[in-house]
Amino acid sequence: MAAAAGNTLIIHPWNPTNKLIKEDDVMKIFDTMGIASKISIQDLSRYQKAFVHSSYVEATANQALSNHKKVLFSACPSDCLPFQDESYENLEFLGDRVIELCVVWYLYLRFPM
């Protein structure tokens, strides 16, 4: 949602339903997969980062604004999640590399030259 204040466009991107995932939520996901008893959450912030889309990152939001003149974000309400520092993309990249390594290792062992 956006509003005009004089020559400045003020954007209201805040959504009170955006929340960081909680440990209970993570464990429910693991429970549906039948692995909750085998998992111990050591660092909840990693799981929370895994659910942050790149469009909800501070740098991305500010970059989008820099393409326009006189555009501002409204203040983040106390019941809303502020923009985050990082998205899940770095974790996704690392996960992709782990899967790639596993597949390549399997193929190497399965089909030796």
Where are each of the predicted segments found?
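Double-stranded RNA-binding/processing signature
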Residues: 1-113
